[in-house]
């Protein structure tokens, strides 16, 4: 996913989201409901400035067919801020797919991480 994201490989990103009207993605400035809305967003998104550094990536599994991927990310274009990303993945007949995603950016917390 990460390689496809930073290189703006729209075909791979589209494939990794579940093709279902119930799939959703809450982005930094948009709420996308359904696979069609997510793919339309990806098709229109600028490929500029997507590089980032990830940190504290955690994969939490629930049985063999459900996982949540959580990570922090940093971009040179947003000093003093930290991005947060969570994705719920399920194992489908065609492979692992994202069914829910959330991306947000906050001011970098001061002090030790908790």
Describe each model-derived feature in a short phrase.
Residues 5-8, 30:
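Conserved short acidic donor-positioning loop in nucleotide-sugar-dependent glycosyltransferases
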Residues 2-3, 58:
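Amphipathic alpha-helical repeat scaffolds
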Residues 28, 36-81:
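Surface-exposed, charged secondary-structure patches
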Residues 7-24:
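Short, well-ordered alpha-helical segments enriched in acidic and aromatic residues
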Residues 17, 29, 58, 72-73, ...:
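A mature extracytoplasmic/lumenal domain signature
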Residues 12, 24, 67-68, 97:
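General beta-strand recognition
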Residues 82-112:
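Short beta-strand edge/turn micro-motifs at domain boundaries
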């Amino acid at each position: 996913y990460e390689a496809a994201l930073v290189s703006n490989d729209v075909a791979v990103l589209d494939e990794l989201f579940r093709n279902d009207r119930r799939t959703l993605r809450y982005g930094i400035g948009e709420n996308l409901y359904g696979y069609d809305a997510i793919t339309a967003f990806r098709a229109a998104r600028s490929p500029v400035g997507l590089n980032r550094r990830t940190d504290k990536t955690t994969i939490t599994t629930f049985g063999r067919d459900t996982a949540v991927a959580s990570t922090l990310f940093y971009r040179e274009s947003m000093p003093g801020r930290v991005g947060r990303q969570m994705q719920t993945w399920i194992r489908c007949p065609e492979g692992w797919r994202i069914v829910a995603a959330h991306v947000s950016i906050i001011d970098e917390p001061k002090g030790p991480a908790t």
